[in-house]
Amino acid sequence: MPIFRRAVATLIAALTIVGATAPLATAATPEHRAQKRQSYVALGDSYAAGLGAGTPKDACGRSSYGYPSLIAKVGRLDLTLAACSGATMADVFSSQLASVTPDADYVTVQVGGNDVGFAPVLLLCAQPDNDATCAAGVAQGRAYLEGDFAANATALFGAVRAQAPQAKLIVVGYPRLFNGKDCSPLVEFSAAEQSLINGTVAELNDQLAAAARRVGAKFANPASAFSGHAWCSRLPWVNGPVEPVVASFHPNVLGQLLGYTPVVGRYFLR
């Protein structure tokens, strides 16, 4: 089982990177023990909530194996996990932004997938012999990406920055889902459909990165980390069709542990 040993070794290294910078990592004296734990607020959608990685704890699909929970645990941070499945940028504005307090030390934001309609597009494209309809659905999402998306994302990230001016703000992107293969009898994604969806994810990440730069935030891009671990790969970090259906095509436990945690966690270095 060498591949699993390598995975475990990678996980240990990733968590060591995060844990090495924990505010209390050197706590050996009463003075250190009395220090206030640093705070971390995680905003966003189902990817940030951890849906698809282990059993969800609530209706928002929050999981103890999502990268916010893992980073907070290893880094000994006080976590406010406000992320919720189905959230759009408007939802983060209206329902999650208040979770960010002025004294927050770290804030991550992962949102945008629902704004471009990834869930309905995936359901549409999963139907057999449906390339034209799939392409139309993807085109609709890309039209928004090329239209109001940049302004809306910049406004949201700017609002988060205004809530906690001293916090380290990290915008988080999305992984490549497909590798050109279709390995399930339950769905049928053609090579053309997979290419369209992957291309839209790449464009989404570009837009998120640009919006992050505009407000002085960091951008954590998981694309390279997930390379070789798309659905239907030898060791996938992304679910295929699963129950509940809403957890399909989300990072699994390995994706959160070995993909997202080191990619996002490195920005917690002081």
Question: Regions from the language model: what does each represent?
Answer:
Residues M1-T29:
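Secretory targeting and sorting signals
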Residues L24-S39, V92-V109, A153-K168, V264-F268:
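Short amphipathic alpha-helices and their capping/turn segments at secondary-structure boundaries
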Residues P30-A83, L97-A98:
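Serine-esterase "nucleophile elbow" of acetyl-processing enzymes
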Residues S39-G44, A48-G50, D78-A83, D105-Q110, ...:
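Structural recognition of the beta-strand scaffold that forms the well-ordered cores
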Residues L51-S63, L122-N130, S248:
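Acidic/histidine-rich helix-loop elements
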Residues K73-L77, N152-K168, E203-A220:
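A structural motif corresponding to the C-terminal end of an alpha-helix
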Residues D91-L145:
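Oxyanion-hole/transition-state-stabilizing segment in secreted/luminal serine hydrolases
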Residues P175-R270:
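Catalytic His-Asp segment of secreted/periplasmic serine-dependent ester chemistry enzymes
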